[in-house]
Design a protein with these regions (language model features):
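Signature of N-terminal electron-transfer/Fe-S-associated modules in redox systems
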Residues: 1-159, 224-226
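Cofactor-binding beta-sheet edge motifs in enzyme active sites
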Residues: 2-3, 8-15, 28, 35, ...
Length: 517
């Protein structure tokens, strides 16, 4: 017997705890972001009060023990956690949040945690949205029983700002924080057959995800020993004052591509509660779900395992550039076979840097996308802003939409200071959360993010931890000043990300390749 959130269940013993929770018991508040890698933390639950990653926990080891999901925690503590997350903007898309909540509840058993303890505990989790700091702030509020809680943010205002930033409808609240919100893989009707993507390009279909995954011949993700390297040489430009070459970067949205569809119906959107930084817009998973449902004559849930998300999904386009002091120079953007047209990116660059001679060159590699947040434009804005910057100098960027960000990094302690003008804030709490998330991604772009691609263009880094995303302990403190402007609200992401990249690059001494690590 297995006790889950206070209820006894008879379950299969030849399975992982995650397979039982989701597949047999319908506990969709436990999310699957990378199974069975055990690296994203989305499937974390409490086993006798101790946080465990359920995708790598055999059920046999926990029979007779008490399993608690985010939905089963003490109601008073649950309410404090939701209030704290809403007060700090600690959840955006929310896919990672229920697992983090479980981790934090387990941490609280040892007493009121410190910031260092919270950040260390979050080392088991990936949050691509918030940059971790709003989560840390929420934890320190919620887990200190004598700490008064601030008011929750206005739901309508928060939704409006979040939707503007993510480019897709996004909601918040208790359902998102505690996992009741249903993402695409959670919303398929009971009994829907599951199609798991194969590395050969097809799908294996079975009654359960576990059976389909086993039939797919899925190869466990791996970390490569191949170095991350830019695929393009830096262009030779006489008089250039700054040069750069970047690598393939995995967007690393935490919710894998998934969609379900009934025969003759419309497929569920893989954008359940966020925009995935624009990176899912080329995903075929919805079309695949519709095709399979029509071919098989029944509802089908199509899922890409994490390894297939990496292998099939579009990457941020690599580029190389050299720029003179007057803004003239050369820019080369890499495309690959099967990628979408990148010409619109060159048109966008021409608007912000008319002196750049830009071209597109095909190289071996995974597909790249034109719709990733600020792709190419952010890097060019960062390079223009970084000219002449010394460590600690503020970098200011005005994005094409009019958003303005000024970012400085204290060389003595790494603290990041951001002043942001995104028009009407609508909800300053939500805007601040998105600012910190953009800082996190901008720092990662310069310092650590990139994936290894072999000479044939095949991605070799297929695990969450191989993408180079900064962890909670690696992410510095971010101080945000939101300028309460009266103009129309605009998204802050490109401006903040580009200004952060410029400041981080200057702090590192303008090395010619990213990532610098």
């Amino acid at each position: 017997m297995l006790n889950v959130d206070g209820v006894e269940h008879e379950v299969s013993l030849d399975a992982t705890l995650l397979e039982v929770l989701r597949g047999e018991l319908g506990c969709t508040q436990v999310k699957d972001g990378c199974s069975p890698q055990g690296q994203c933390g989305c499937c974390t639950v409490l086993v006798d009060g101790v946080a465990r990653v359920s995708c790598v926990t055999p059920v046999r080891r926990v029979v007779g023990r008490s399993i608690t999901t985010a939905a089963g925690i003490d109601p008073d503590l649950s309410d404090r956690i939701v209030t704290a997350f809403e007060a700090t903007g600690g959840s955006q898309c929310g896919f990672c949040t229920p697992g983090i909540v479980a981790r934090l509840v387990g941490l609280a058993r040892r007493g009121t945690p410190t910031e260092t303890q919270v950040r260390t505990a979050l080392g088991a989790h990936l949050c691509r949205c918030t940059g971790f700091q709003p989560i840390v702030e929420a934890a320190l509020l919620a887990l200190d029983p004598i700490q008064p809680l601030p008011e929750r943010r206005n739901p309508a205002a928060a939704e409006a700002r979040a939707t503007l930033e993510s480019g897709r409808p996004q909601v918040g609240g208790a359902d998102v924080v505690l996992g009741a919100f249903r993402f695409a893989a959670d919303s398929a009707p009971s009994g829907t057959k599951v199609a798991v993507a194969q590395s050969t390009g097809g799908y294996s279909v079975a009654s359960t995800e576990a059976e389909a995954a086993a039939a797919s011949g899925k190869v466990q993700g791996r970390n490569s020993t191949i170095a991350v390297r830019p695929p393009l040489p830096i262009p030779m430009v006489e008089g250039a004052v700054i040069s750069l070459a970047t690598s393939f970067v995995e967007p690393a949205y935490v919710e894998p591509d998934a969609s379900w569809c009934a025969e003759g119906g419309d497929p569920a959107s893989p954008f359940a509660n966020a925009g995935a930084f624009g990176a899912k817009r080329t995903s075929t998973v919805s079309a695949d779900a519709r095709r399979l449902a029509d071919e098989l004559g029944e509802p089908i849930l199509a899922i890409w395992p994490r390894e297939e998300v990496v292998a099939r999904g579009a990457k941020r386009p690599p580029l190389s550039l050299s720029i003179r002091a007057d803004g003239s120079g050369r820019l080369t953007v890499a495309t690959t076979e099967g990628s979408e047209d990148l010409a619109p990116l060159l048109d966008a660059v021409a608007e912000i840097a008319p002196g750049l001679e830009a071209s597109i060159v095909e190289v071996p590699g995974p597909k790249v996308g034109a719709t990733h947040r600020g792709a190419v434009v952010s890097e060019v804005l960062a390079a223009l802003a970084a000219r002449g910057l010394a460590p600690g100098d503020p970098a200011t960027v005005v994005a094409p939409n009019g958003a303005r960000a000024t970012v400085s990094i204290d060389p003595s302690n790494g603290t990041v200071k951001v002043d942001v003008d995104a028009g009407d804030p609508i909800c300053a709490i939500t805007l601040r959360s998105y600012v910190i998330g953009a800082v996190h991604q901008g720092l990662g772009m310069v310092r650590s993010e990139g994936i290894a691609v072999d000479e044939m263009g095949v991605v070799q880094d297929l695990t969450i931890r191989s993408f180079g995303i900064l962890t909670a302990t690696q992410t510095p403190s971010v101080v945000v000043e939101v300028i309460d402007a009266s103009g129309p609200a605009v998204a802050c992401g490109v401006a903040v990300m580009a200004a952060t990249m410029a400041a981080a690059w200057a702090t590192a001494g303008h090395p010619p390749t990213w990532p610098t690590a």
